[in-house]
Amino acid sequence: VQGFTFSNVTVNAFIIGFNHNNTREGGNRIHFLIGKISGKDVALCDSKYNNTGTDAGFRMNKSNSNAGGWNGSYMRKDVLGNSGSPANPPVNSLMAALPADLRNNMKSTTKYTDNTGNGQNNASSVTATTDYLFFLAEFEVFGSRSYANSAEQNYQKQYDYFKAGNSRIAYNHTN
């Protein structure tokens, strides 16, 4: 995936919601996280983690900027693979690395996030994207916001999984 090779790694997906926020995100959806390794919540990371640069890697953008917001991000389009579809995922994307039987059952979800970026923090910056793979928003995890666009929470709901007290921490999958 974007220059990182996963070898002999089994990452389990697990369900965090059924029909979550279905009036905005679409009905008959099962929301899941990727993933857990040996029961521990993990985040997929590579050597580019917490570094800026222009080469391929697990980073939000290839520049030190959030211009274009989530919609225009390198992470959304190239790393996760939302510029394609489960039937035709972009080469070297996480979507392409998923098992075909999982991809064959994926449905798109509408997510509302700041798709302008640059710290404008206004309601007009919050628009919809249609994604198969996505990052959870701050409000969806914590039920409150400190850093995200203040208007995002008007379109989002906290996942019951996190409301129930499950860990909000994901560890680097290589540790």
Q: Can you say where each PLM-predicted feature lies in the sequence?
A:
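Collagenous Gly-X-Y triple-helix signature in extracellular proteins
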Residues: 1-175
